[in-house]
Amino acid sequence: MAKEFSRTRRIAQQLQQELAQVLQRDMKDPRIGFVTVNDVDVSRDLSYAKVYVTFFEEDEKLVEQKVAALDAAAGYIRSLVAGRMKLRVMPELRFIYDSSLVEGMRMSNLVSRVISNDEAKQKQHGVETDAEQGDTKEEGDK
């Protein structure tokens, strides 16, 4: 059982690399633009592959159009990748927009904003921050 899983994972990794090359070099569709293949999940029977992609654009409408263009070209992309990989059955490709990168950046910005707001409030009220308290303790120890 574990051996079968490792094979699907290896195929998913190779498929990710081949898809990235095909999408960068061989696709001439201007609707797609620059696309990054973040991850590929292959079903156990190798009949389906979920391809997680991101784009530079964050506009939902543009992202939907780009994913639709990829889905429309999935058969062509599949045939290009099949020529590069030695598989008996080439998985059917399903493209999915991966918003985890955008969400991660948004969460990071929120955390940074909260930290800076807390530091500003502490300075207004005359409360020392943890870093400043550590400096005064070291000076007192000397």
UniProtKB/Swiss-Prot annotation:
Q: Where is this region: Disordered?
A: 119-142
Q: Which residues form the signal peptide?
A: none
- State one molecular function term (GO): ribosomal small subunit binding
Q: Which UniProt keywords apply?
A: Cytoplasm, Ribosome biogenesis
Single GO BP term: maturation of SSU-rRNA
Indicate where this protein resides in the cell.
Cytoplasm
Q: Name one Pfam family in it.
A: RBFA
Record text on subunit structure and interactions: Monomer. Binds 30S ribosomal subunits, but not 50S ribosomal subunits or 70S ribosomes.
The record's family statement is: Belongs to the RbfA family.
Q: What does this protein do?
A: One of several proteins that assist in the late maturation steps of the functional core of the 30S ribosomal subunit. Associates with free 30S ribosomal subunits (but not with 30S subunits that are part of 70S ribosomes or polysomes). Required for efficient processing of 16S rRNA. May interact with the 5'-terminal helix region of 16S rRNA.
- What's the protein called, per UniProt? Ribosome-binding factor A
Organism, scientific name = Shewanella pealeana (strain ATCC 700345 / ANG-SQ1)
Q: What is the lineage of its organism?
A: Bacteria, Pseudomonadati, Pseudomonadota, Gammaproteobacteria, Alteromonadales
